[in-house]
């Protein structure tokens, strides 16, 4: 539903009139740009390149620049810009690396003017000089920026950022020779177009790629940047070092940022993924947007204010194949729906609570704050309802500190430092982490690690030490669970299909259910008895312990060297009366070498005590390997990880993700994993656990997280002869013209891993130095020092 409010703005000799409206495009848009008279807008994408007139009630298509029968990659646009001095001049950045200029004044249908094919990869951004009509700047995925003079066929200068791909370039509005560029590795560089050999300034602005930047139209040194770290930062470039003035935290990666005209502290942003809305922020209030536009149903790819002196109209293009004009007055204001109370936990468990002064005063009986009344009320300026600060407000802040010794976050630090996340078999990792959690008093976490070991490890990998059973009253003995029981001196007189009879309704809790007079029934009528119907030999169930397992009675596999444990006879309570009295022990001993008796040969068999020393059990091997596959528990493990994350224990969620790896990764979406990883890494860095943080990044199963160590890293190299910084060229000093980092063996520049002696400071390629020191202990540089490689 289109909103019908209308705004008329007088700008010099022209008048802008319009309302909130949109039109459907033939294809998704990648970028938009507005003509200098604010009457037309150009929309460019992979399959669209059109100019629309902005009329009072609607958009009207004026010109389709995709002409010709054959489709060309030169028309597949990643960016478009309309010259602000010449209304007939446009430039596009093609996905095949070509920069194309267009002259709308040409009489033919084809308006294409010039093609520049010097870039080797996709061109991400093109930008005209704000005051020089013939200067065009481009930034490409190949890491180079090129400055073109439209009166020539080739570029006049090339700028190399010595970095990864260039994401955005913008000429400064106030400084004639200055432009800013943003890079994939999180750096921002400032260049002078007269000096293409080196940048004037470089600093790390974001943790990850910097997708966009924009110079402030009024303040000379203000530069806004947005990146994948979901932040918008405002930098003061007038100081010796770039100073961060404001930081706005958004909910998704920032794809575009544009300062709002005539509003010094307002800027508009849109996201690269997930979030489809457009936000207008007041950088002085970075937590709640001043305005929000919700018209698009897919990712917004381009935004532009309609006129450089009109803050009321914002144009946008989207992947939902729509072009919209937003009226600022029609925007929703999230501050009206925001919770007026704030709650936050500190690093060490302190709790801060902020609420409106009026609410706190009502509870405590104090008089609420009424604002500054030094000036009469009739001098008060009437505020615009569109402004985010509509009135005076005051909040009360309460801080609740944790009691000394009453908890804290020491467990978090100890757990992070002691957890084992890699380098061992899965069973050992789970056991180690369970032990750590148990020693720290976190029994639920310890039990979770134990269950993960049981689910994902085969029975043979489970240590027997943790699965011993306490039997009898007089003491305890170790009976490894994953083995079968062998009754000492027991004759093999029971059939292979004999099953243990469990009486229905028998309430058994903490007793060992191997009765000296327990009856084994082989009747076919025993199908309704409780227990397992697995076709095995003799089943023995309900042994007291941590798990309820079934075991095989196999006298042929008895091992005399197995550890045995004497079980007192009173440990086996009588279950029921003996159905039939079997022959005595002597009879069983006489037939110890006879074959097993089948079910047809003996209808009823029983186990009778031989003497007081008969209750000897030993363990040899598992009953059967019929286990539920680990994938069966995937949903359960996923819910468990979500439970810990929702409880605030993101440490447990990330640790399990790393330890289980691909076993559980497929059950949790990539965005959730990335959120858990970044939250845990942020906590580790707050506690200054840098080594653990680095290990988590290296072991991460999320691609977006594992590349964090490869970004925002700057290595400063000085010449080893004259000590001059070598920032412009990689390996040659500008002053003494000598190469740095020469290998003492091959006398070539080392451009990779460099190893040197701490005694004499000579070194070279790692493999060369290792091979040299295998045959000689003296330095290869000839200094006479005895070097050693360790």
From Swiss-Prot:
Q: Report the stretches of sequence that form zinc fingers (C4-type).
A: 718-740
Q: SMART domains from the entry? A: WD40
Keyword terms: Autophagy, Lysosome, Membrane, Metal-binding, Phosphoprotein, Repeat, Transferase, Ubl conjugation, Ubl conjugation pathway, WD repeat, Zinc, Zinc-finger
GO MF: ubiquitin protein ligase activity; zinc ion binding
Which sequence positions carry the modification called Phosphoserine?
A: 155, 470, 496, 594, 598
Residue positions where Phosphothreonine is found in the record: 581
InterPro entries tied to this protein: WD40/YVTN_repeat-like_dom_sf (IPR015943), WD40_repeat_CS (IPR019775), WD40_repeat_dom_sf (IPR036322), WD40_rpt (IPR001680), WDR24 (IPR037590)
Q: Tell me which residues bind Zn(2+) 3.
A: 757, 760, 785, 787
Its transmembrane ranges are none
Tell me the outcome of changing residue 451 to E. Answer: Abolished interaction with WDR59 and assembly of the GATOR2 complex
Residues that, per the record, bind Zn(2+) 1: 719, 722, 733, 736
One GO cellular component term of this record is: vacuolar membrane
Q: How is its activity regulated?
A: The GATOR2 complex is negatively regulated by the upstream amino acid sensors CASTOR1 and SESN2, which sequester the GATOR2 complex in absence of amino acids. In the presence of abundant amino acids, GATOR2 is released from CASTOR1 and SESN2 and activated.
Major localization class: membrane
Give the Gene3D superfamilies listed for this entry: YVTN repeat-like/Quinoprotein amine dehydrogenase (2.130.10.10)
Q: Residues that bind Zn(2+) 4, according to the entry?
A: 762, 779, 783
Q: Among its keywords, does the record have Oxidoreductase? A: no
Which family does the record assign?
Answer: Belongs to the WD repeat WDR24 family.
Question: Briefly, what is this protein's role?
Answer: Catalytic component of the GATOR2 complex, a multiprotein complex that acts as an activator of the amino acid-sensing branch of the mTORC1 signaling pathway. The GATOR2 complex indirectly activates mTORC1 through the inhibition of the GATOR1 subcomplex. GATOR2 probably acts as an E3 ubiquitin-protein ligase toward GATOR1. In the presence of abundant amino acids, the GATOR2 complex mediates ubiquitination of the NPRL2 core component of the GATOR1 complex, leading to GATOR1 inactivation. In the absence of amino acids, GATOR2 is inhibited, activating the GATOR1 complex.
From the Swiss-Prot or TrEMBL record, give the protein name: GATOR2 complex protein WDR24
Native source species: Homo sapiens
Lineage in the entry? Eukaryota, Metazoa, Chordata, Craniata, Vertebrata
